[in-house]
């Protein structure tokens, strides 16, 4: 598992709790939105290499909401994650479940689920690579993001830099994105979701990293599979944290889904993932970049 920002993070932000916000003003000079996205992707790729063989905590919380708006069921898990090196897959170990130490059976089940997901990702990656044309000299300017070329991803959106603001003393570009009516017809669930995604991103103007993202679906998206789901609404939020030395680390990712299952059961579920206690290792040296006062759960 890599300590990397979501691929769609290169496309959005704002309105997050605790953010120190200022009035949005027009950019001092014209900024090309697509060039800005490309620069962000290049910057994030360079930064990702700094997190090879890093460790961090990943806290996941899932909440099923009742029709009265109250939490009906809450489940939490804490993982200790070892990031992979380069393109290699990392690994993670289940540490806690609902605030108590995980049992051996729970650890085995989590490991089996991760292995199943890993194999699925490898198969999907292989299929995508088999369909992909050979790399050309322009790959640095049109890299692969996830399983698609950057140009294909941003070609699905109308992207605009709508202003600038200062957040925590740092300048940032405010970038809005919305589905492009002329986007290619979707071929997969991922394409259908992208073709319905709209939101705002805040891009740090110094390091060209994604400070935060807020996005939502503009229309329902049907997902087939083991249990078909009709997602009528989805809200997504992401925040990043500057660490210094041009490095940023994901802080939180939040997702809420509402809709119906194939059996017409009500769906209203939220997910929150928090990342903390990052440690970077270099040969015999260890760098602890946790925020002050956070003791962490990792040994």
In which residue ranges do the predicted regions lie?
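Structured extracytoplasmic
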Residues: 23-197, 206-211, 216-234, 240-251, ...
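Bacterial N-terminal signal peptides
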Residues: 8-18
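A residue-level detector for well-ordered beta-strand positions
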Residues: 201-202
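Bacterial N-terminal signal peptides that target proteins for export
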Residues: 1-9
